[in-house]
Swiss-Prot record:
Classification via InterPro entries: aa-tRNA-synt_IIb, aa-tRNA-synth_II, aa-tRNA-synth_II/BPL/LPL, Ser-tRNA-ligase_type_1, Ser-tRNA-synth_1_N, SerRS_1_N_sf, SerRS_core, tRNA-bd_arm
Claim: Kinase is one of the keywords in the record: no
Subunit and partners: Homodimer. The tRNA molecule binds across the dimer.
Protein's job: Catalyzes the attachment of serine to tRNA(Ser). Is also able to aminoacylate tRNA(Sec) with serine, to form the misacylated tRNA L-seryl-tRNA(Sec), which will be further converted into selenocysteinyl-tRNA(Sec).
Compartmental location: Cytoplasm
Record carries keyword Acyltransferase: no
Entry EC no(s): 6.1.1.11
GO molecular function annotations of the record: ATP binding; serine-tRNA ligase activity
Protein name, entry field: Serine--tRNA ligase
Length: 427
């Protein structure tokens, strides 16, 4: 959530900045609410002053032996008007907060202009796409050919956009997860965290998924209401909700492996087939809670931590800075890491690393105690995938295939595979 003061003192400038995203701020609605709020506050203050004055008069009139009933009636009437004003002020505040929940974050100044992913800016590339002397298969043909992926069985169990992995591919997915966790905890200084996969609505409001993106969530029909997590970002970031973190504890760096659940409402096309876009998938998520002055540097570091995984696996990728129109609702700045997929002959997103500045923290009331002032101030929050496990599995299958449809296991994963370095019939 943006600072409400922006809508009181810098409404037009805030609207202009939000316009970079293609978001049209309803300045008339905000302006009307603000004008009414200010008028009510002035009126309420005047009523309070008048009530206080008349209350003093009651004591003086009583001391003089005068009839105080008219004064008591007047004070009672003022009290009723004050209650009405206070109720209207509370209503205005609720309406203002409801509007604010639908307003995205302001973008950093170095986020490029643009409306769609076509306007994103490539920052750099690492590695060269493999050159095959045969027509490379996509991950679906490879996985099914190995007899280790069963989409029909998954459809029988759950429906479309699910998969059953067995044998060496199930183990390869586990190996990828363990490898990522080991690097992030052992080399990058993250604390491994296990969290609930069901969360309440307050948690999703805190990180920005609610109310705007409810259709993307799986809601459990139960009392109390729960939602399946769309990403570990939600429960992990909410660990600091309503907390004041002491300065010496910062930065907080968490890594968390969870399944993720998304309805993928409205998605279609090539990603409906295979493992790229499923209702249930796994991620290793990186979350950082930092001092405001450290968030820009932390964003670069977190993105680099995700890149290290790709490089250790030998997977070609590129870093892309998202343009204004493609940056997510809660983010001030986002880098996407896109891995090369030979089966699609294109780079596809495998990690999204974002700096939210104080946008989530204001919703969460997540604060730190500034030692210079002794007062609580909002933290900055960041997160990114380190990496999406299923998409990393896809990238390994497609980049490490041979003509026979076998898969060469990346060297760093061989110990996690019990020494197996080749997956396939002749392995």
């Amino acid at each position: 959530m943006l600072d409400p003061r922006l809508f009181r003192t810098q409404l037009e400038e805030t609207a202009r900045q939000l316009g970079r995203r293609g978001f049209v701020l309803d300045t008339a609605a905000f302006g009307a609410l603000e004008e009414r709020r200010k008028a009510l506050q002035v009126e309420t203050q005047n009523l309070q002053n008048e009530r206080n004055s008349r209350s003093r008069s009651i004591g003086q009139a009583k001391a003089r032996g005068e009839d105080i009933e008219p004064l008591l009636a007047a004070v009672q009437g003022l009290g009723e008007r004050l209650k009405e004003n206070e109720a209207e002020l509370a209503s205005i505040q609720e309406r203002m907060e409801a509007l604010l929940l639908g307003v995205p974050n302001l973008l950093d100044t170095d986020v490029p202009e643009g409306r769609s992913e076509a306007d994103n800016v490539e920052i750099r590339r690492w590695g060269e796409p493999p050159q095959f002397d045969f027509e490379p298969k996509d991950h679906v043909d490879l996985a099914v050919g190995l007899g280790c992926a069963d989409f029909e069985a998954a459809a029988k169990l759950s429906g479309s956009r699910f998969v059953v992995l067995t044998g060496p591919l199930a183990r390869l997915q586990r190996a990828l997860t363990q490898f990522m966790l080991d690097i992030h905890t052992g080399e990058h200084g993250y604390i491994e965290t296990y969290v609930p996969f069901l969360v309440n609505a307050d948690s999703l409001r805190g990180t920005g998924q609610l109310p705007k993106f409810e259709e993307d969530l799986f809601k459990v029909q139960h009392e109390p209401v729960f939602y399946l997590i769309p990403t570990a970002e939600v429960p992990v970031t909410n660990l600091v909700r309503d907390e004041i973190v002491e300065e010496e504890r910062l930065p907080l760096k968490y890594v968390c492996h969870t399944p993720c659940f998304r309805s993928e409402a409205g998605s279609y096309g090539r990603d409906v087939r295979g493992l790229i876009r499923q209702h249930q998938f796994e991620k290793v998520e990186l979350v950082q809670i930092v001092r405001p002055e450290d968030s820009r540097e932390a964003h670069e570091a977190l993105t680099r931590h995700a890149e290290v995984i790709l490089e250790r696996l030998g997977l070609p990728y590129r870093r892309v800075l998202l343009c204004a129109g493609d940056t997510g609702f809660s983010s001030a700045k986002t880098y996407d890491l896109e891995v090369w997929l030979p089966g699609q002959q294109s780079y596809r997103e495998i990690s999204s690393c974002s700096n939210f500045r104080d946008f989530q923290a204001r919703r969460l009331q997540a604060r730190w105690r500034n030692p210079e002032t002794g007062k609580p101030e909002l933290v900055h929050t960041l997160n990114g995938s380190g990496l999406a496990v299923g998409r990393t599995l896809v990238a390994v299958l497609e980049n490490c295939q041979d003509e026979a449809g076998r898969i060469r296991v990346p060297e760093v994963l061989v110990p996690y595979m019990g020494g197996v370095n080749l997956i396939g019939p002749a392995a």
